[in-house]
Amino acid sequence: MVTMKDLLECGVHFGHQTRRWNPKMKKYIFGVRKNIHIIDLQKTLRYFRYTYNVVRDAAAEGKTVMFVGTKKQASETIKQYADTINAPYVNYRWLGGMLTNFSTIKKSIRKLEVIEEMEASGQIELLTKKEKLMLTRKKEKLEKYLGGVRHMKKAPDMLFVVDAAKEKIAVAEARRLGIPVVAPLDTNCDPDVVDFPIPGNDDAIRSIQLFCKEMAEAIQEGRALAGSEEGEATEEVTPASEAEKQEVLAEAMSEEGDALQESEVVEEEEK
């Protein structure tokens, strides 16, 4: 379990500039250094250990914890630790309705399965060069958005979120469904929207790695207590019908201009 030394070495105590704070975080702040809010690590340690136990107990009860973190410094770490414990994750972009309209998300996952079946059977090689290209592009896009949730059978029981302010849509959807949210809270966050807050730096890579590592270990420990080491089990994929294949192909061909449009959206977001 996390120690004070871990927190200090990973810079968990460094908050944002004082002008970028949320006054609701005042009780978690130790002081100010060079116009930077310093988080009270005594409180961080207490909240961290409590939340670790909450997540461990949830995993012991067979509950599913989804990892969410889409910003650059969190994306790879979220995937890395979620993959080690076979947990669902979102690390590229949160699609609206990912929780509240999960049935639609499942339909998109089905399209990914259909394309993969066409590849495995060699049927994709019988298509024109353009059709094959467009299907491949669609597969890559679906994998990017949904690869981390493709084996989920239902909405998760808990969310672990890195940067609750950035992932406000995910947090709002979870709250609407009564799904508890666990999150490190930087000094610019609103603690009222998180069920199990851990005051701490949610921007530094080492800090993010520490949070993800501890949550993954809590889940592993919980599963071990329950005598289960497995996460989301892969289910047998239903063979695709010819109608499904034609529908996915037609949709892929109609998205010819989407690749350019998406790159423009990403560029705009990064400005």
From Swiss-Prot:
A Gene Ontology term for the protein's cellular component: cytosolic small ribosomal subunit
Signal peptide: none
One GO term of the biological process aspect: translation
Annotated Acidic residues bias: 253-271
Residues in coiled coil: none
Disulphide linkage map: none
GO molecular-function term, one example from the UniProt record: structural constituent of ribosome
Record's keyword terms, sorted: Ribonucleoprotein, Ribosomal protein
Pfam families per record: Ribosomal_S2 (PF00318)
CDD domains documented for this protein: RPS2
Region called Disordered, residue ranges: 223-271
InterPro entries with a match to the protein in the record: Ribosomal_uS2 (IPR001865), Ribosomal_uS2_bac/mit/plastid (IPR005706), Ribosomal_uS2_CS (IPR018130), Ribosomal_uS2_flav_dom_sf (IPR023591)
PROSITE patterns per record: RIBOSOMAL_S2_1 (PS00962), RIBOSOMAL_S2_2 (PS00963)
Domain of life: Bacteria
Family: Belongs to the universal ribosomal protein uS2 family.
Protein name as catalogued: Small ribosomal subunit protein uS2
Species per Swiss-Prot/TrEMBL record: Wolinella succinogenes (strain ATCC 29543 / DSM 1740 / CCUG 13145 / JCM 31913 / LMG 7466 / NCTC 11488 / FDC 602W) (Vibrio succinogenes)
